[in-house]
Amino acid sequence: MSSFDLPAPSPPRCSPQFPSIGQEPPEMNLYYENFFHPQGMPSPQRPTSFEGGGEYGTTPNPYLWLNGPAMTPPPYLPGTNASPFLPQAYGMQRQLLPSDLGWLPIPSQEELMKLVRPPYSYSALIAMAIHGAPDQRLTLSQIYQYVADNFPFYNKSKAGWQNSIRHNLSLNDCFKKVPRDEDDPGKGNYWTLDPNCEKMFDNGNFRRKRKRKSDSSSSTSSLASEKTENGLLASSPKPTEPQEVLDTASPDTTTSSPEKRSSPAPSGTPCLNNFLSTMTAYVSGTNPISRSVATPGLSSEPIDKMGQNSLNFNSYTPLTNLSSHGNGGEWANPVATNALGYGGSVFNQFSPHFYNSINTNGILFPREGTEV
């Protein structure tokens, strides 16, 4: 390095290539001038004055210097005060050169795949070892040896996976312990495969697999079917319910039990729909006939007003079942009707919650002479 004097202003030809961003002292510009040649573009390139100049060729990217030994940074460029065009990771990137990874031989892709954890469970590894044995049985040490020889991944941390092998042998029902014969030298029992557990490995494919739905549901299919049948029988209607419906449709509904009177009425009964529409028209005052018809024994108060006072549709509850086939005589024979065109026997078929508000004994609908 030649001696030089520190000028007050920095050289003008270095400022375009190496702009100062306020992080390095002004003296660094002079170092850039003496040790780095200006380039046509400010893109990061390896300077040609390092390590003898002509020994290395110029490369477009300093992160791809993988053709030579590692370089040491010059003493005048510490890592904390690196220039803007040399990033902070420049010194760290050189630690990952192939020369530093010489202990890792990768001759082929197959060798690389042996260093990856195999996609087999410990139970599958045990099954593979036992299945490949001549006598279809192995000792614990022989299973260890098979796993270590065929899968180099398990050469490290042997204590961990060997403990898992022992747990799988003792807890998995697919592995059976066979005592050693008296004339067989050595120690330790043999382990063999249960013939009933062949399905867990998919016909020789020892990869991890999900449990089949057919296998999981076969053991509980009969129990589930019995529960379903019992539930359907419990939710089905009793055979005596139609008889109860016929009983509730008889005229002596007032003497029937409360359970029978609480049965819901079918919504599609035409007689009931006609009756409700007529009653609604009567209460709202849209029926012109109801205003002019008078009933003997009533006061001078209009009928529509009395109907509004006596009828309370807000407290209306579902009516009992009305059967149009059980009482055909009442509907077929002509009877005397009241102002709404219905006989008194018709109102006896509804629940007491409804006709408690309708006096069927002489206020609106007299019953004298209406019974057949």
Curated annotation (Swiss-Prot):
Reported phenotype of the disruption mutant: Mice are deaf, impaired in their sense of balance and suffer from distal renal tubular acidosis.
Q: A GO molecular-function term, please?
A: RNA polymerase II cis-regulatory region sequence-specific DNA binding
Q: Which InterPro entries would you find in this protein's record?
A: Fork_head_dom, FOX_domain-containing, TF_fork_head_CS_1, TF_fork_head_CS_2, WH-like_DNA-bd_sf, WH_DNA-bd_sf
Which GO BP terms apply?
inner ear morphogenesis; positive regulation of DNA-templated transcription; positive regulation of transcription by RNA polymerase II
Q: Which CDD domains does UniProt cross-reference here?
A: FH_FOXI1
Localization in the cell: Nucleus
Cite the record's Low complexity compositional bias ranges. Answer: 216-225, 247-257
UniProt keywords, alphabetically: Activator, Deafness, DNA-binding, Nucleus, Transcription, Transcription regulation
Q: Does the keyword Lipid biosynthesis apply?
A: no
The UniProt annotation gives the DNA-binding region as 117-211
Q: Which Pfam families match?
A: Forkhead
- Please give the tissue specificity annotation from the record for this chain: Expressed in intercalated cells of the epithelium of the distal renal tubule.
Annotated region (Disordered), positions in chain: 1-23, 202-271
Q: What GO cellular component entries does it have?
A: nucleolus; nucleus
The protein's role, per its UniProt record: Transcriptional activator required for the development of normal hearing, sense of balance and kidney function. Required for the expression of SLC26A4/PDS, JAG1 and COCH in a subset of epithelial cells and the development of the endolymphatic system in the inner ear. Also required for the expression of SLC4A1/AE1, SLC4A9/AE4, ATP6V1B1 and the differentiation of intercalated cells in the epithelium of distal renal tubules.
Descriptive protein name: Forkhead box protein I1
Q: Which organism is it from?
A: Mus musculus
